[in-house]
Design a protein with these regions (language model features):
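Active-site-proximal helix-loop-helix substrate-binding element of RNase H-like nuclease domains
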Residues: 1-105, 116, 124
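Conserved small/polar residues in nucleotide/adenosyl-binding loops
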Residues: 171-175
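A structural signal for well-ordered alpha-helices, especially hydrophobic packing surfaces
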Residues: 96, 100, 124-127, 131, ...
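Short, charged alpha-helical motifs in flexible N/C-terminal segments and linkers
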Residues: 166-167
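Short His/Asp/Glu-rich catalytic/ion-coordination signatures at enzyme active sites or charged loops
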Residues: 73, 119-147
Length: 175
């Protein structure tokens, strides 16, 4: 069964806490939004609903409160939680139905979505959950190589400019 969601990387992490692996992820409206308009500002469901559907959603703060007295989802009355969750699912599907046709109009962004962004969802979810092992010796060796290369590039820049300057100074670079 193919699934549509909003911020599925987060959902995968939550479900993993209960040893549930989310499979069949096909579409993520947060990623669709990023690809369609990466500079649009916020890509959370409430903002996307307002932007794409002209619909103001029930916010989590409306049902849970805010600050130190904010309730957790399992403390919210079932009727309120159900209304919130149902709207969340409905809005997510409506967003997908609006954005997906737009994404399909351009092969480049569609390719990024299908072949890069979506396959990365489970990978990044696991990385966030488990971390990444790093070999300190290899990291140190790379750091030394980069530092050496940086010195070489600075010398080359000085030769081109005919004088030494601070390469991280906007004022020096402008002059």
């Amino acid at each position: 069964v193919l699934k549509v969601g909003q911020n599925l990387k987060y959902d995968r992490g939550i479900l993993a806490n209960y040893d549930i692996e989310l499979r069949g992820i096909a579409f993520d409206t947060m990623l669709e939004s990023y690809i369609l308009d990466s500079v649009a500002g916020r890509h959370d469901m409430d903002s996307l609903s307002d932007r794409w559907l002209k619909h103001k959603t029930i916010t989590f703060e409306e049902i849970a409160g805010k600050g130190k007295n904010q309730l957790t989802f399992n403390q919210i009355a079932l009727e309120e939680a159900g209304r919130y969750a149902a709207e969340d699912a409905d809005v997510t599907l409506q967003l997908h139905l609006k954005m997906w046709p737009k994404l399909q109009q351009n092969e480049g962004p569609l390719n990024v979505f299908k072949n890069i962004e979506m396959p990365l969802v489970p990978v990044l979810s696991r990385v966030e959950r488990n971390g990444v092992k790093i070999d300190p010796a290899v990291l140190h060796a790379h750091s030394q190589e980069i530092a050496k290369r940086l010195i070489e590039l600075e010398k080359k820049a000085y030769d081109i400019a005919g004088e030494e300057f601070n390469p991280v100074s906007y004022t020096h670079l402008r002059a």
